């Protein structure tokens, strides 16, 4: 052991200087460029912990966790907790869902404060015709209606996993499904970015109170990316990472795709063993996926890429998710050993407390990283590692994305700790070599291997204030030093695990005697390489292997000093044989060929007591990917916390008084010398240096004491950094993975005198201009793991001081070394006298949001004690004036106003000029005259006695004999005039004749008119016809008349015979067919009737109204009250004269207007009085439609349709009122529609909603009462009962309504749906929809959406019953 320490002391410091420079350059470059990754918003973090009601974890695609949403799930948060107020101009939405319902549903929605408008959202429609639609909502500020920016038709997604992405870029929206673009649509939007109001909300699985279908099923991914190209890049990275046959797209049901390994920044409490917690995976960045190469490597070329990359995180303590992996690619190579030889080595992971992960036999060991944090918690940015292990065998090639393992917190991801671990015991996602592959350590030939990259955050440099850059991760690139070769043809699952050592140290205050106080540092663990020996056994090519022997245990020794060092975390590499080995922690002697190097840490003792609290960390920078979690319940007041770190950017206070000078700390004791390393082989020859100046020849000097250690020999091939440098040790080096006990300081020897200048050397040969060929490869040397005591950070660069642990015995004189870096920081001095308190600084900036709590954080770590209720705050100030509201509905027509006051009497006008007016219209016909006398055939005239009910005759048939009345007789042959007969005596009463046929009213009117005089100007006197009647043409047969009263028959005595007439035609013949009517003949003689004439019967019923007459439109009413009461009976344009006041009015559209009359013209005193007023002075009203003639005396409410179909801009209330008035319905009718001011269920008066039936215009019952329509069944009615319009047409059959659909804009309970009522019935936009009900369904409230451009049926409801007295 002493020998090794002495050899280590000869380690040249210039090698460490180069490492420091490289690490410093990488860190500075990383800090300058930053790690600004693209912004992505994971919407599943809104679910929070504990899970809300109806939300649970479920096994998702690929066996990874997902969230299951039930019907009652309601996940919503204020949008500002996750979404930036100004949204991305271009973006993409990545989705992985499994719906379990054909109804689809809303995946997410960002709404306004009232949950009426969706600003941004994604929805799956219900299944229709074997297809579904993916709908993207994109509504710009200022709109009051949700806008469907893009709609894509996709196959049915129900009951299967679906992965798709929607990208918005410029004016185009594209849909990608399974990494293939399905379709692309254009949409118009303004140049302004999409902004969200502060009170906006975001919902997952629903859209709040929008009334849209909720999503039921599983959601595994729901992420918004700020770069719309991200889905394509992820797909390309996935394809490039595939190998062999799995080189491109694979069905989701075949290969589980792990898009990203996720480590959460908060861990469960520390326990001896914690089972792995599954967390939902998210997609990795393109840079990470692009590191996996899908290109095949020629067989026989082993490849193991191990690398560590440091990051300068944009902030510390921000709760960002760590997406860091270590990749180890194991490629097929030539077998190095025979089957069963036992020299396959496993790279094991151990920690500083002795935990190890090994495998024996054919066990499958999952790759793990064991992390423990101090006091049971892990700070943000703690080291995290994972590894890929890949074989390029075409048949057994695993998907690299399936080989990612993660570790989080201080819990231990299970590792295999005994030799009989089963192959299927590794957790999901653990890397596993395929059968016929083993991992061995051996020579890798002359091939150079491609380095890979691992990303590891480091909790380091927390107290470094000089550099000004918060560094929480480290980047170091190593060339391959571990070769995994195929050594066996039988199936053996072996993994290689590599983890860099991360040593976190904290000083405890004053220095001690045993070790210098150091600031927290980080050193990457460097790997060692080993080769199989000739005998096939795996040995380390170091002196340590030779001394300790195969499988030997490390010697026991005193415990390490811990007074000034907090518990360290380190992971070392241990070579362990893959087969036939003993239990973990060491090998029995002679049990195998695998030697253990650096196995001081294989045994782990029981957990120690919790360490002291760590020092405060450096304030983190503002986060970019950290979002506020859901608001928790107020907790109880906690105990006063310890003083926090200094707030950022505070104003400097006044300088305090200078403290006393602290005492200088003592110098630490010198550590023991390390073992001497072997001299390395010469490396490549360097370029010649510039010639030196000629010096004087000096005398030989006296030999001085041994000088300081010289530099190492020429570098050979080894652990290159891929930056143009080669690094190799010169001998056996011990793994410096733990602090060592400092030994006593030995005094330095006397300094030698300066030697004389040597003689001038000969000029060397000119070197070539290019680098020479590489020299022969040297034997691989061990790579040291640098302890944290080797590194001090000052001003952002690595500096190395004299390290006793590396000092060995003096080596040969070397060439002068390179200029050294500044020395290490001195030990911390004693605390000075406290100064006077400074002035109070200004209030610090607002802290950053806390970390998101996800499903893997135990509940007991989150809950706090319930806080006391706070006092009520004072009322806030008056808010700003809101925007103007919507224009209100048109109000109902007001009642007629009271008559205005009489105006002042006007001035007397000039006398008008009297002009003869036009001739008046013909007067009405005079009353009919009494029946005339009856003349028999022989000319006897029988006087008719006067009857009291008959009026006097208006004329006589024969001049001079007013008693004669002639009647038309049957036309006979023309005869000669006979002599008038003498007056006969009154005859006896004849027998009663049979009843006559009924008389048509039209024929009766014609008969009466024929009795009137032809000159109607003389209304009361007819003109003599000179006893001659010209017979008109015979009329058409009339309808039978009513039965008249019994008439009186008067038969006089037979008169004297008259003059014989001309002989008639001889003989009798059969009557012929009546001929057509002939032309009118000349006037014939007076008719000679042989029988009495029946008197007219009583007046018949009134006939149908005739055409409008030419009567005067002036109507006389008694007074003003009479005029107002009968306003509905007077048509527009009618003149009204009031008898009591003599005023004159005209009926206009909205009421009455008074007319100014001129000067009174008196009537002469001798003028006869005016005729009496007609008994029916009003303008005849059109008859009611027969459909309105039903008996409405019982209390009912009528449901009537408008006379025409109407689109979305209706003004329906006004039309209902207007058309009801025109139809003679005097009660108030309202539209059967919901509005933005009133729900449909409240249109009818509350007192009449239950007791009155709803009927059509014929009184047929449609609904039992108003409330029965809104019971929730859609308002079912009997489709055999028609619904009539105001003009009496059946809307269910009349072609004037081509679409038998009724607008309503309500849900089944009559509540308005603000997104389904055509913007309060004010628009006919094709893109806007409203709810309507097809009457064919037998429902009046069916929930079907129709474009507001459709012209559909609008119903009107009588909102209250009005009796006849009210009418």
Curated annotation (Swiss-Prot):
Residues 719-748 are annotated as: Nonhelical region 2 (NC2). Residues 1032-1086 are annotated as: Triple-helical region 6 (COL6). Residues 229-604 are annotated as: Nonhelical region 1 (NC1). Keywords: Cell adhesion, Collagen, Disulfide bond, Extracellular matrix, Glycoprotein, Hydroxylation, Proteoglycan, Repeat, Secreted, Signal. Residues 969-998 are annotated as: Triple-helical region 5 (COL5). Residues 749-783 are annotated as: Triple-helical region 2 (COL2). Glycans are attached at residues 243, 247, 305, 323, 341, 348, 375, 402, 673, 730, 792, 795, 799. Detected in testis, brain, heart, kidney, skeletal muscle and skin (at protein level). Detected in heart and skeletal muscle. Prolines at the third position of the tripeptide repeating unit (G-X-Y) are hydroxylated in some or all of the chains. O-glycosylated; contains chondroitin sulfate. Residues 1097-1111 are annotated as: Triple-helical region 7 (COL7). Structural protein that stabilizes microvessels and muscle cells, both in heart and in skeletal muscle. This is Collagen alpha-1(XV) chain. It comes from Mus musculus (Mouse).
């Amino acid at each position: 052991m002493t020998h090794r320490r002495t050899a280590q002391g000869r380690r040249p410091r210039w090698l460490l200087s180069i490492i420091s420079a490289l690490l410093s350059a990488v860190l500075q470059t990383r800090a300058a460029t930053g790690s600004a990754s693209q912004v992505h918003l994971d919407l599943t973090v809104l679910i929070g912990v504990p899970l809300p009601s109806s939300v649970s974890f479920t096994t998702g695609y690929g066996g990874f966790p997902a969230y299951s949403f039930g019907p009652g799930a309601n996940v919503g948060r204020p949008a500002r907790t996750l979404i930036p107020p100004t949204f991305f101009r271009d973006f993409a939405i990545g989705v992985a869902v499994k719906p379990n319902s054909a109804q689809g549903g809303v995946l997410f929605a960002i709404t306004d404060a009232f949950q009426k408008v969706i600003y941004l959202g994604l929805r799956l429609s219900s299944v229709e015709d074997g297809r579904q639609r993916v709908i993207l909502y994109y509504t710009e500020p200022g709109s009051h209606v949700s806008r469907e920016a893009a709609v894509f038709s996709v196959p049915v997604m129900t009951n299967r996993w679906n992965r798709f992405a929607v990208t918005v870029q410029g004016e185009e929206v594209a849909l990608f499904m399974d990494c293939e673009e399905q379709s692309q649509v254009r949409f118009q939007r303004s140049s302004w970015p999409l902004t969200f109001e502060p009170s906006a909300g975001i919902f997952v699985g629903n859209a709040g109170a929008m009334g849209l279908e909720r999503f039921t099923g599983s959601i595994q991914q729901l992420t918004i990316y700020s770069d719309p190209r991200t889905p394509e890049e992820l797909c390309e990275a996935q394809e490039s990472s595939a190998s062999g046959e799995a080189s491109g797209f694979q069905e989701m049901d075949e290969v589980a795709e792990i898009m990203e390994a996720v480590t959460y920044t908060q861990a469960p409490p520390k326990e001896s063993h914690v089972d792995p917690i599954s967390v939902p995976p998210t997609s990795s960045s393109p840079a990470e996926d692009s590191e996996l190469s899908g290109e095949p490597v020629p067989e026989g070329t082993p490849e193991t890429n191990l690398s560590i990359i440091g990051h300068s995180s944009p902030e510390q303590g921000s709760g960002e998710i760590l997406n860091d992996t270590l990749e180890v690619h194991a490629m097929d190579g030539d077998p190095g050993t025979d089957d069963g030889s036992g020299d396959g080595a496993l790279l094991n992971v151990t920690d500083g407390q002795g935990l190890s992960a090994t495998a024996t036999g054919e066990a499958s060991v999952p790759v793990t990283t064991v992390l423990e944090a101090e006091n049971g918690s892990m700070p943000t940015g703690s080291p995290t590692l994972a590894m890929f292990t890949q074989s390029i065998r075409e048949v057994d090639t695993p998907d690299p994305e399936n080989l990612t393992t993660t570790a989080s917190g201080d819990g231990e991801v299970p590792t295999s700790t005994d030799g009989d671990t089963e192959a299927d015991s590794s957790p999901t996602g653990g890397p596993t070599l395929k059968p016929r592959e083993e991992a061995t350590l051996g020579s890798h030939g002359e091939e150079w291997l491609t380095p890979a990259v691992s990303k590891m955050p480091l909790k380091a440099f927390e107290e470094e204030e000089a550099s000004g850059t918060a560094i929480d991760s480290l980047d170091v690139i190593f060339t391959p030093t571990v070769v995994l070769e195929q050594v066996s043809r039988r199936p053996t699952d072996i993994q290689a695990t590599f983890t860099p050592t991360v040593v976190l140290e904290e000083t405890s205050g004053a220095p001690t005697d045993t070790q210098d106080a150091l600031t927290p540092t980080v050193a990457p663990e460097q790997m060692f390489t080993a080769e199989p020996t000739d005998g096939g056994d795996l040995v380390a090519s170091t002196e340590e292997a030779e001394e300790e022997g195969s499988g030997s245990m490390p010697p026991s020794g005193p415990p390490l000093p811990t007074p000034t060092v907090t518990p360290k975390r380190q992971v070392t590499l241990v070579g362990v044989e893959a087969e036939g080995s003993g239990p973990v922690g060491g090998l029995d002697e002679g049990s195998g060929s695998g030697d253990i190097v650096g196995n001081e840490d294989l045994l782990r003792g029981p957990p120690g007591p919790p360490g002291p609290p760590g020092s405060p960390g450096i304030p983190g920078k503002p986060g970019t990917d950290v979002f506020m979690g859901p608001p928790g319940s107020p907790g109880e007041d906690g105990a006063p916390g310890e003083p926090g770190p200094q707030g950022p950017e505070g104003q400097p206070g006044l300088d305090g008084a200078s403290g006393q000078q602290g005492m200088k700390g003592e110098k630490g004791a010198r550590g023991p010398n390390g073992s001497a390393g072997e001299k390395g082989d010469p490396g490549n020859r360097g370029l010649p240096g510039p010639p030196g100046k000629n010096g004087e020849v000096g005398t030989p000097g006296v030999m001085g004491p041994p000088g300081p250690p010289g530099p190492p020999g020429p570098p050979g091939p080894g652990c290159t950094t891929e930056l143009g440098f080669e690094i190799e040790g010169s001998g056996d080096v011990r793994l410096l993975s733990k602090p060592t006990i400092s030994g006593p300081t030995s005094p330095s020897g006397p300094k030698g005198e300066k030697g004389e200048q040597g003689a001038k050397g000969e000029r060397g040969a000119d070197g070539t201009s290019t680098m020479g060929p590489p020299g022969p490869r040297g034997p691989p040397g061990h790579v040291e793991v640098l302890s944290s005591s080797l590194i001090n950070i000052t001003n952002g660069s690595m500096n190395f001081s004299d390290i006793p642990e590396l000092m060995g015995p003096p080596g040969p004189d070397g060439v002068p070394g390179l200029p050294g870096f500044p020395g290490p920081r001195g030990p911390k001095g004693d605390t000075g006298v406290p100064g006077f308190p400074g002035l109070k600084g200004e209030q610090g900036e607002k802290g950053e949001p806390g970390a998101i709590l996800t499903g893997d954080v135990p509940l007991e770590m989150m809950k706090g004690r319930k806080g006391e209720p706070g006092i009520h705050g004072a009322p806030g100030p008056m808010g700003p004036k809101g925007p103007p509201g919507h224009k209100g509905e048109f109000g109902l027509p007001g009642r007629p106003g009271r008559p205005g006051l009489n105006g002042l009497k006007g001035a007397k006008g000039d006398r008008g000029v009297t002009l003869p007016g036009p001739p008046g219209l013909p007067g009405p016909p005079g009353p009919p005259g009494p029946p005339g006398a009856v003349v028999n055939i022989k000319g006897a005239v029988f006087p008719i006695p006067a009857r009291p009910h008959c009026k006097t005759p208006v004329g006589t048939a024969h001049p001079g004999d007013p008693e004669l009345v002639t009647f038309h007789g049957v036309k006979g042959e023309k005869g000669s005039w006979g002599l008038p007969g003498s007056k006969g005596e009154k005859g006896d009463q004849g027998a009663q004749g049979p009843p006559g046929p009924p008389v048509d009213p039209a024929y009766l009117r014609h008969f009466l008119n024929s009795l009137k005089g032809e000159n109607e100007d003389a209304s009361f006197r007819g003109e003599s016809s000179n006893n001659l009647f010209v017979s008109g043409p015979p009329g058409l047969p009339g309808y039978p008349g009513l039965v008249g009263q019994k008439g009186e028959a008067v038969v006089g005595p037979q008169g004297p015979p008259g003059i014989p007439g001309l002989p008639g035609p001889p003989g009798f013949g059969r009557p012929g067919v009546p001929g057509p009517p002939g032309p009118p003949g000349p006037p014939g003689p007076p008719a000679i009737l042989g029988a009495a004439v029946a008197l007219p019967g009583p007046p018949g019923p009134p006939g149908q109204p005739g055409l409008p007459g030419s009567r005067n439109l002036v109507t006389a009413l008694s007074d003003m009250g009479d005029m107002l009461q009968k306003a509905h009976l007077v048509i527009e344009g009618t003149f009204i004269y009031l008898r009591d006041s003599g005023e004159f009015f005209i009926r206009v559209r909205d009421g009455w207007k008074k007319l100014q009359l001129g000067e009174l013209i008196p009537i002469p005193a001798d003028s006869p009085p005016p005729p009496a007023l007609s008994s029916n002075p009003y303008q005849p009203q059109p008859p009611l439609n027969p459909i309105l003639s039903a008996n409405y005396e019982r209390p009912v409410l009528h449901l009537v349709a408008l006379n025409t179909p109407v689109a979305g801009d209706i003004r329906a209330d006004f039309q209902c009122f207007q058309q009801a008035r025109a139809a003679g319905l005097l009660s108030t009718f309202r539209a059967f529609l919901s509005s933005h001011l009133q729900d449909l269920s409240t249109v009818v008066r509350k007192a009449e909603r239950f007791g009155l039936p709803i009927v059509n215009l014929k009184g047929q019952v449609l609904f039992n009462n108003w409330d029965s329509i809104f019971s929730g069944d859609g308002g079912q009615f009997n489709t055999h009962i028609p619904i009539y319009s105001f003009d009496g047409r059946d809307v269910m059959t009349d072609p004037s309504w081509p679409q038998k659909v009724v607008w309503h804009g309500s849900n089944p309970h009559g509540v308005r749906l603000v997104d389904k009522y055509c913007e309060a019935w004010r628009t006919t936009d094709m893109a806007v929809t409203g709810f309507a009900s097809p009457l064919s369904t037998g429902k009046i409230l069916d929930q079907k959406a129709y474009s507001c451009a459709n012209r559909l049926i609008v119903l009107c409801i009588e909102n209250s019953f009005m009796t006849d007295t009210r009418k």
